[in-house]
């Protein structure tokens, strides 16, 4: 399986991670928001 890069994830998810990494939201908030991002086109869950 090829290594995933930032291009493989929705920008919205990357933005949520940025908020989490910089302490703007909690881990729980990040996971709740990330779960709403849905699935990738190939059916593999992003989170």
Curated annotation (Swiss-Prot):
Please state, per the UniProt record, what induces or represses the expression of this protein: Expressed during stationary phase (at protein level).
Name this polypeptide is given: Protein YqhI
The organism's place on the tree of life at top rank: Bacteria
């Amino acid at each position: 399986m090829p290594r995933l890069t930032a291009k493989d994830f929705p920008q919205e998810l990357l933005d949520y991670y940025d908020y989490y990494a910089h302490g703007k939201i909690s881990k729980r908030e990040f996971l709740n928001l990330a779960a709403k991002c849905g699935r990738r086109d190939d059916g593999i869950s992003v989170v």
